[in-house]
From Swiss-Prot:
This is ATP-dependent helicase/deoxyribonuclease subunit B. The gene is rexB. Its EC number is 3.1.-.-. Pfam families: ADDB_N, PDDEXK_1. Its cofactor is Mg(2+). It comes from Lactiplantibacillus plantarum (strain ATCC BAA-793 / NCIMB 8826 / WCFS1). It comes from the Bacteria.
Length: 1200
């Protein structure tokens, strides 16, 4: 029985000293039992290393076996000693099972709990409580100890927490005692077992040199071994003994010094012999790292700086985290590739350790970076199962029932690809399934199907209405309907019966049985196994293990649920909460795919000390030292208040350290990380984070840099073409070619810069050589040449061939004028939208087009109903108008396209708003009619053909002998004004936003609608007014803003009706004909002023003015506008038939562009910085300039 300490700083080889002690004792006492204990995290590596050292010591390097020496972690020691003990055979209780049990306890004692009762339903609380219970157990505190702590605490939150903890903890211990074995119980059982053993002749070596702490339970194991006669040797990272007084927090070796002090005092009080301390004296690290160790510990020999740089410590900065990882990878490849005279000096991937304080910032970059560099790696962090598709399937499955088949929930289930239909007894082909699900998703987004629609027996009918649709179902639509109904009926036939049985389940056991049987019968387990096999085929061992581990964890949680809650009524909400908490606490068992791979970890974790090279990435002042945050039920203040009471209890009781203590340990934690390296230590940090915020070196790194006169290197993500040192950018062939391309693109961009002066830029010879080598490589050359060819790529569409034009458009174009406006905005957008017919998928929503259709339909129906009953609009009373409106609106809302307005409470509210708006507009039009001689003659007048609808004659233009264009459209309203023998026709277009006639846009072909409609009226004059009528004149084209205006107090000072008339005033152009204008507004016939209805004013001299909007045009001016509009139509058709598809978006007035709301940006890849991509800037023109230009232009001359 004795206690022995092996001390020394991190630079020393503690294990060498420990193994030497073990060998000496083993030789002297070969029949004794030897245990070498290390943290579980590094057990395997330590076991291999210790056995290798023993083999060397006994002269058997090639083949060595040892039965008397066992290398274990504490929990593995428990298995070894107690595997046949009854106490060790009881069922294990996982983290999920613990959560379930605590959840039931909380519910049972809800009325007794002062604080915890109201927290039961809070997400994460049960898991947080489980952590607190585990901390109490590892601190060797029993329920009666917590009761005593509560009794001694002052009234307040702490006492209430301890009161609740005592109730829950007591019930928890009673519920698990002799029934379940919890993780914390294993060491309790081991301690009890050891107390019954005679350990004389047992030698225990505890290696703690690589880390600083030993939890209270493990300390209890060590002290029990001492009491039972074992010889215990403990290595500690400590450069001096701590005998008389405990160390102060904040000192470098606080944790190990505190442990030394506690164990020494324990042995001294119990008169257990303490042997003379042994110091590890053999350095295990390179000289430069020895110097770093001395400096960090503040040794006298390190007090002055170094003139020569430290050759074992290096640092560099990069422009981003991505570049930082890439540079680390490049260095690793270079070091592995370099061969030395002595093979023992060569590097393997397993010799490298990459660490940072928190891997989150690098997580998404690891895989692409190291895969591209072809570096095998292993991330030494536990990964939660919470995001596995099986977990998503279960959650979404029950959400479907709870939320009544909402779109997102059904899609969540289908997209897990774990529940799939069977075709002829076999699972559906995955690609065919994905296609069917995608089509179904598009359909329900378009139709708004949800709820009971999913479970109806009737087929869903897919339809797609397009221009020219003759109303006949196509084979393509029938096939899409088949695929959609395959998914629809799979859901309808599979889920409702399952949900019905679950609702009828009498208890938890029955419900869980139904769930497992359902998942198994639906082939979920088969799909998981298929995923495993596919991963194995890819040689992805890690991914292959995940499906089975997740299913086993799931089944284990269900077993525990049945054991703990199986006899109680089944509550789906509670069940899902427990499952989710269980999966969040569950993690995959990490399986390295190869023995030779780079290890990636966090500096807060225990690390093996056999890595030759360590990279400390992300070494910024944000994480070195770290910002310590705690999220425990017992706060740091609570723990501080408990320290005095804890010291009065029997035994050793140590709660987890507070944030203050942990912050004090940061220096030691980083010291251990630095000294994990044996040969080289690299510090790196990005200059900026992802948000372009500047990042600074850690003060730790700055101190080291100053002390050792270290040179800082900076690496950029993009190489300098003129720099002859290409080494930072040379890696795998694929990665190197990407940098070669960057160099040549930079050269190309620089040399094509119009503002550049001087000789052309040339790449450094090394880049020319790299390009030649890569493009001539037998295996890689073809790909390299393809990638390099991208340098000559220009983002310019190629003109269509005549054959392509004919295939897309034929010989005749039937079009609306808005399509040609699109052509003038951007030719390529026209090609995508109307040539290739690309479009965004339809969504079941109330769009601007839908509301416009509603307004048009109601106003059309209202005016037609009044005309049918021979009631002039101006003479309709308020009551009459209201009744007609109500009738027409009801009829319109009954139409299928407006069912969306009854699909939800929100839509019902919007329906009321739409009805109010159209009512206001109807009354506004009636009031306008009272002041004007203009009367609505027709509404919704179609010219040209749309599908099966036939209207007036289209506007037909012959382009050449074989090509023509036919323009169609629909005029919202045609007004007629009869003045003596002269008839005038004017058009009104309803708009849901403010519009005016823009001469500039009309000139450039961006706003041709109104002029085209006027032209259509002229071409269909006889059909509109009859052949017996004298020639009509065009009155003009006006916009009416459909709105329910908000009026301010100042607006209604002149009267409410006058304010509404002003808000609904027409905008557009009118014929500058005094005879016409006089009859448009009766209020101005005898006086002067501005019209309340139309966009003109009458001056005192009786003449008329269009004001700033230049809304009055002469007959000649109108004719020129119409002629120019026709020329634009012809010019657009000529360009389309010629195959023109230029990427030429317009930019108007230096702000408005054709790309602002385009859905095709990702296809066009337009970049104004590229020489070949530029906006087509249209010079601003006033109305006068446009009219003057038209006057001077000759017929057929290009409008630009």
């Amino acid at each position: 029985m004795s206690l022995q300490f092996v001390l020394g700083p991190a630079k020393m080889d503690h294990r060498r000293t420990m193994v030497a002690q073990l060998v000496a004792t083993l030789m002297a006492k070969p029949q004794d039992q030897f245990f070498y204990l290390v943290p579980n995290h590094i057990k395997f590596d330590t076991e291999v290393d210790v056995l290798n050292r023993l083999a060397q010591a006994f002269g058997q390097p090639d083949l060595y076996a040892q039965t008397q020496v066992q290398v274990f972690s504490f929990t593995r020691l428990a298995w070894y000693l107690m595997k046949n003990e009854a106490a060790y055979q009881v069922p294990r209780l996982s983290a999920a099972g613990i959560d379930m049990l605590l959840y039931r306890i909380l519910q049972r004692h809800a009325d007794e709990l002062r604080l915890f009762g109201g927290e039961i339903s809070q997400t994460g609380f049960v898991t947080q409580l489980a952590r607190e219970i585990n901390e109490l157990q590892t601190a060797n505190l029993q329920p009666e100890d917590v009761v005593q702590l509560a009794a001694n605490a002052q009234a307040g939150d702490l006492q209430a927490k301890l009161h609740d903890l005592a109730i829950v903890y007591k019930d928890f211990v009673a519920a698990t005692a002799d029934k379940y074995l919890k993780p914390a119980d294993i060491l309790v059982q081991l301690n009890a077992y050891l107390r019954r053993q005679d350990l004389h002749g047992t030698h225990v070596y505890v290696e703690l040199a690589g880390f600083a702490q030993l939890p209270a339970q493990e300390q209890g194991i060590v002290t029990t071994m001492l009491e039972q006669g074992a010889d215990v040797t403990i290595s500690l990272m400590l450069d001096h003994k701590v005998v008389d007084r405990a160390p102060e927090n904040g000192t470098l070796f606080y944790q190990s010094g505190r442990l030394y002090y506690r164990l020494y005092q324990y042995a001294r009080i119990r008169q257990i012999p303490v042997s003379q301390d042994i110091y590890a004296e053999t350095p295990r690290v390179a000289p430069g790292l020895v110097a770093l160790d001395d400096f960090w510990r503040g040794q006298p020999q390190a007090a002055t700086g170094y003139e020569e740089p430290n050759t074992n410590v290096h640092l560099f900065r990069t422009d981003s985290r991505q570049t930082e990882l890439a540079q680390v990878g490049r260095m690793i490849r270079a070091m592995v590739a370099k061969k030395h005279a002595d093979p023992a000096d060569d590097y393997h991937y397993r010799d490298f350790l990459i660490m940072t304080r928190h891997l989150d910032a690098y997580q998404t970059m690891l895989a692409p970076t190291f895969h591209e560099l072809e570096i095998p790696y292993f991330v030494d962090l536990q990964r939660s199962m919470a995001d596995h598709p099986l977990v998503e399937l279960i959650n979404a499955l029950f959400d479907i029932d709870a939320q009544q088949y909402q779109y997102r929930d059904v899609m969540r289930v289908l997209k897990t690809e774990l529940l799939m239909p069977n075709i002829n007894g076999q699972p559906m082909d995955r690609q065919a399934y994905r296609q069917a699900v995608d089509l179904t998703e598009n359909f329900i987004l378009k139709s708004g199907y949800h709820g009971q629609r999913w479970v109806q027996r009737e087929d869903w009918q897919y339809f797609q209405l397009t221009e020219g649709d003759a109303g006949v179902e196509t084979d393509q639509n029938a096939e899409i309907s088949r695929q959609i109904n395959l998914i629809h009926h799979f859901v309808a036939e599979t889920l409702p019966p399952f949900f019905k049985k679950m609702r009828q389940a009498p208890d938890g056991k029955a419900a869980v049985t139904l769930l497992v049987n359902f998942l198994t019968s639906q082939g979920v387990t088969d799909q998981l196994l298929a995923w495993r096999d596919q991963a194995l085929d890819r040689q992805d061992v890690r991914a292959a293990a995940e499906p089975e581990q997740t299913w086993q964890t799931f089944c284990g949680m269900l077993d525990e649920y049945v054991t703990i809650l199986g006899a109680e009524p089944f509550e789906i909400t509670d069940f899902l909460a427990l499952l989710q908490a269980g999966f969040e606490g569950a993690s995959y068992s990490q399986i390295p795919s190869t023995l030779d791979q780079v290890l990636i970890s966090e500096s807060g974790m225990v690390q093996s000390q056999d890595h030759k090279v360590v990279f400390m990435v992300g070494a910024t002042d944000l994480v070195m030292p770290d910002r310590i945050m705690t999220n425990n039920l017992l706060s740091d203040v609570d723990k501080e208040n408990l320290q005095l009471t804890l010291s009065s209890l029997d035994g050793d009781h140590y709660l987890n350290d507070s944030a203050v203590v942990q912050l004090g340990d940061e220096s030691c934690l980083n010291y251990l990380a630095f000294l994990s390296a044996r040969r080289h230590l690299f510090f790196s940090a990005p200059l900026k984070d992802d948000q372009e915020t500047d990042l600074n070196w850690s003060n730790y790194v700055r101190r080291i840099q100053r002390q050792f006169n270290l040179r800082e290197h900076t690496y950029l993500g993009t190489p300098d073409p003129t720099n002859a040192d290409a080494r930072p950018f040379v890696g795998t062939k694929r990665r190197t070619i990407s940098h070669v391309i960057q160099v040549y693109r930079d050269v190309l961009t620089t040399n094509t810069d119009r503002n550049r002066v001087g000789a052309p830029l040339q790449p450094a010879p090394v880049w020319v050589w790299l390009r030649q080598q890569l493009t001539r490589d037998p295996q890689f050359g073809e790909l390299a040449r393809q990638l390099m060819a991208g340098l000559s790529y220009r983002n310019q569409p190629v003109k269509l061939t005549p054959a392509s034009v004919e295939a897309l458009y034929g010989h005749q174009i039937y079009t609306s004028i808005s399509k040609l406006e699109e052509f003038y905005r951007n030719q390529y957008a026209y090609f995508l939208k109307y040539g290739l017919k690309l479009r965004e998928r339809d969504v079941f929503e109330l769009s601007a087009a839908s509301t416009g259709e509603f307004f048009h339909a109601v106003l059309d129906g209202l005016i037609k109903a009044l005309r049918s009953d021979q009631i002039p609009l101006a003479q309709a009373s308020d009551q009459q108008l209201g009744q007609y409106l109500e009738t027409v609106t009801r009829q319109i809302l009954d139409q299928p396209q407006f069912t969306i307005l009854t699909s939800s409470n929100r839509m019902a509210y919007l329906q009321r708003q739409l009805i109010n708006t159209v009512r206001q507009i109807a009354f506004a039009i009636r009031n306008q009619s009272k002041l004007s001689a203009a009367e609505p003659k027709q509404t919704e007048i179609l010219f040209g053909n749309v599908g099966k609808e036939h209207g007036l004659k289209a506007l037909d233009f012959q382009i050449d002998a074989t090509h023509s264009v036919h323009v169609r459209g629909k005029i919202d309203r045609l007004d007629q004004i009869q003045v003596a023998d002269q008839s005038y026709l004017g058009i009104v277009d309803y708009k849901s936003s403010q519009h005016k006639f823009d001469f500039q846009e009309a000139y450039y072909g961006l706003a041709m609608q109104m002029l085209t409609y006027l032209d259509a009226v002229l071409h269909n004059e006889q059909a509109l007014v009859g052949s017996d009528q004298a020639a009509v004149k065009l009155a003009g084209a006006l916009y009416m803003h459909i709105q329910n205006p908000t009026l301010k107090p100042k607006d209604i000072q002149g009267g409410f009706e006058a304010a509404l008339l002003k808000k609904n005033k027409y905008k557009g152009i009118l014929l500058d004909d005094p005879q016409l204008l006089e009859h448009l507004d009766s209020e101005l016939q005898q006086g002067n002023g501005t019209s309340k209805v139309y966009p003109f004013a009458r001056k005192k001299d009786g003449s008329y003015s269009g004001g700033r909007a230049a809304s009055l045009v002469t007959n000649d001016q109108l004719e020129r506008l119409l002629q120019h509009n026709s020329q634009l139509i012809i010019a657009a058709a000529e360009a389309i038939f010629a195959g023109e598809i230029q990427l030429n978006p317009i930019r108007l007035n230096d702000k408005t562009t054709a790309l602002q709301y385009s859905p095709y940006l990702s296809i066009m890849q337009f970049d104004a910085m590229l020489a070949e991509n530029a906006y087509r800037d249209l010079p601003p023109l006033s109305a006068k300039q446009v009219l003057d230009l038209l006057k001077t232009q000759k017929g057929g001359e290009n409008h630009e």
